[in-house]
Structure formats: structure tokens, C-alpha cells
């Protein structure tokens, strides 16, 4: 048996994988990664070149064979040089010393964030990335795959463009107050915008700026601070991305500060120095802003990054190390990264607070003040600060005094109201009848578009989505107890139409721009009318039309008066049962004369011109919530100031007797579970 197999003639030095032909005449085996090398065997079976002489480590030690590919015989000899060492003067890029000379260590050759080599040497950072070289912006090459990912194909249902009523935006009233307000623009042109940005705007199929963009672009390009109020879905994200990206393309990156004496860099620079910082309240909103930033920074030297809580911090750190020029962040995670020494704000030129009122509602004011006032961010006079939101109650405008300088106040449309593109319907439905009425509505409207259903509790979101699945309706749910991966997957399935019904808690109510939502159903009405405004604002975006249905019963009578006013403002039909319940008197003492957050008489006006320059009485206090309030406190926490008062209402910002119902870190539940 052994003789027939010639086992006795075998030796360790002989193998069919040897570089010489074996006894059967077959060609020598060449590993796949070496088959195209000139020193390898030809495809017709010609013998391979002899291997290099063994090094001092012995014949079997590939680590000691300097003539072979580094990393051993399994390494890809054609792989790029990832060493942080600088190039050899004679052009040799391998690790092997040449002619007895060892290359000097170059700490900027690899992993320099912020510029990726483009600031100094001008090298591109990756496929499709541009560079800044010799004081000029050089766009990168086009990449069809990336373009398809960012901008979609023509008529792509997942990419929403302007709707049939977009032209009606020109009729929306605009108020801009401040000194020397720049004239608005009417088109995406150069000047004031950079040509490369205009090319990306064209790829995104944007044709005409929205009213907020018409005013915000020249205001920001002229170096002014801005506080902008606009309806949801009116293009606020483009309102701040367009001007800051355009100026970045024209002015280039800022130099990285030199390390302090005694500090050394070991190749990869661990601290990032972004020039633009965008703060937003939730993971979903920062992810959405990041996607828009990637779109309009396509083929440029600007590298956007996003960081938020609830996700793996290691992957976010690696993303930052590869380069971070524009950072989109939630306040909590940003404070964490600053404490770790991984992000410095010393180079910040632009600070943007998006959905600022929601961030204060969620109890983020201490983190925001620490980021803006307690770290190394430039002084208010040395940066541009922009605030964007759909509502600006008085406490936000008071915050603007500390963060903004000589700002322009921009109010577009009836801020805090709803779009006339949304057809609003209010149905009287008792709690035990809601599921059957919901099924009737879904059967009537079908699943041709996307339907977003809002509920108040996480348990109800899971319960209702399971019920719809049992009724053969493709539904999914999103709420704060889901992991980040589950939430992202649910949103992706909803956006793509594979699961056209999404049941959500308020986590998805503000800021999310989900294309082609045709129907919003308020299964549970919120207790605050502003939350209702932002919920139904998920449809009827960018001039498209939509339907909003609300289930109302006597348990919601606290918002009946505001709801009636809202329907009248938007020229919608007011059901008779709403008027009847309002006349019963229960709805007329609940809000202190229509004084909810953001919906007081002055919520859309420049407070510098109201009440003696921010010194007058608040517009949303009153006796309905515990008597007169002093200064700007007390509206939600009895008569005590809402900033640290002892009453601590459900929306308070501290206080020993309560805590923020929306995740105030001082509240009884600790930090919020939403973000």
C-alpha cells in the first residue's frame, strides 16, 4: 500500500506546491495573490522564479525574508504601503532599507484628520474625495456608485423632490429683522454659492431655494449670525448646509494647531479639529443631517462625520480619525468625546443648533452651555452661530442672547402653525374603538404611500405594530427601547417602502425627513399642540400634499382650543364635536390664553423688539399653571422659576421636586432613554 502511494519517497522538502513542476507534469501551484507577479509562474506552466535566499531567521521564517512580501508569503505584495513612514527619497515605498539608509518618520503621512494630507501635500483622501492644494479646491473624480447611493436614480421613490405645490412657497410671508439684513437670493447661482456646491445641488434635483434658504444663504455668506424659524419641511437643513459648505469650498481648511510642548504624535493623530459643528437632539436627526452633508460635500475636501449615543463609540472614533471637517453630533456624545480628548473645538468657525427648542425640552441645556461656553470653542465674536427650529419660545430667544451676536431674526410663514398642503381630519374615537377605526382607515387609503402612526407609549408602539402584522398589514415600530441597529433597520424598511406602515413614539416626531409619507395618523393625540404640529409635519413636505388624521376623545380636551385655532389657521374644517367640547368650558382654562410652548403671541417675533428688549413679562405664563411667574420661569412648574425652581414641572429644567419629563438628567429616571 505504501509502495503504491510512494509514501516512502516523500520528504518535507518536496511538494506539489514547490515552484518546480512535479513528477506528473502539472504546473506548480501559485497562490491567487501572486499569480500576476512577474516573478511568479506563467499561466502556461512555466516554472516560477526561485524564492529568495533564506534570511538569518531560518528557511521557514517568512518574517525574516526581507526579499519576499512583508507579512509572510500570504501577504499581498501589491498592497499599498500603510506605513506611517514618509517616502524614501529614491521613491522606494517598501519597508526594506535601501543602500543602508533608513527613512525618517513622518507623523503626517498617515491618518492626519481634518485634511487627510490635503492641507499640506494635497493628496486625495479616498475614492471620490477632493483635495485642497496650493490654495485651490480641486474636486475629486465622479463615482457612479456613490452618486447612485447619495442622490438616487431619476424618479427614485426613496428620494423626495419638490412637490406639486412647491411654487406656493413664494406666497409664504417672511419677516427678517435686524440691522442691515442682506437681500434674499432667488436661485442657486454663483455668487454667492460655490460652483461645486451648485453642481451637487443639481445632482440632488433641487431647482429653486425655499423661502428660508433664500434668506439664510445671503445672511450666512455675509458673516451674520442667524436665528431662523420656519415650518417643518421647509428646507432648514439646506438653509445652513449650503452657505457653510460653500464657504468651506472657497476658503479651504484651517491649519491644525501645533501640539503643546512635551506632546508627541505617533503616526495617527488622535484628536480631530472640525471647523463646523451641528448639534441636534436625536440620533435619527443627526443621522439625517449627516446624510445630507455627505450629499452636498460629494467630491469635495470636506469630510462630514456623525456621532451619537447608543451606538458603538469605537467605530465613531475610527471614523473621526480618518478625517473630520464637519461634525454632526448629539450633545451628550459630543461631551463624552471632548472628555476623552478626541475632539477639539478650537477651530470651529460655524456652530449650528438645530431643533434648539427640543434640545432644551429634553434637558440638554447644561451640555449645550458646557460645549459652547465651557470648552475651547472660539468666542461668540470669533465664530458664526446659527439657530434653526420650527418654534422659538421665549426661553430659546433668551438663550440666543448668550450664543449669538448682532443676529438676524428670520421668521418664515406662520411659525408654529401647519402647512396648508396637509389635509387635516379629526375623528371622534373612544379608546376601545381605535383599533377597528384604524383598520377601516388603512383599508380605505391602502398602502400606496407611506403611513406614519404616532402613539404615546413604547408598549403601545409594539402592541399596535404586532396587531397590524396579525391583520396582514406590513408594519414595524420605532421607539426608545429599540437598539440603534433595530431603529435604523426599521427606518430603512419604511423609507424603502418594504414596510409602508411605521408605528412610532415621539422619538420620530421632530426633524425627520422621510420622503413620500402620504398619511400621518395620531392614534394618541399629544398633550402639547406643538408636538401635534411636528407630528403631522412629517407629511406635506417640500410642497407635496398629505393627509393627517387624529383620533380625538374627551381625554384630549386639554388641547381642544389650540386644535380648533390650528385648524382655522390652516383653513381646515372644524368638526362640530370640537366646538361642542370647547363650549363646555373644560378646554378654555388649560393654556392660559393660548400660551403653550412656542405658541404664545410672541413665539414667532423677535424678542429684541418685544417687552423692552427681552425684559418684559413672559408671553406664556399666566395663572392657568400656578399663578404669575417671575422673569421667564414658572410656566410649567407652578410659580417657581423653571430653571432650577423647587416646583419642577413636567417640562422643568431641574428643581428638587421634579425633573424633566423628557429625559432631564436631574429627573428620577436619570438620562433619557431616547438618545
From Swiss-Prot:
Name of the encoding gene: ded1
Chain positions of motif DEAD box: 354-357
GO biological process terms, semicolon-separated: cytoplasmic translational initiation; negative regulation of cytoplasmic translational initiation in response to stress; positive regulation of formation of translation preinitiation complex; regulatory ncRNA-mediated gene silencing; spliceosomal complex disassembly
Similarity comment: family membership: Belongs to the DEAD box helicase family. DDX3/DED1 subfamily.
Family matches, as Pfam families: DEAD (PF00270), Helicase_C (PF00271)
PANTHER family, A to Z: ATP-DEPENDENT RNA HELICASE DBP3
Species of origin: Aspergillus oryzae (strain ATCC 42149 / RIB 40)
UniProt name for this protein: ATP-dependent RNA helicase ded1
Broad EC category: hydrolase
GO molecular function, one term: RNA strand annealing activity
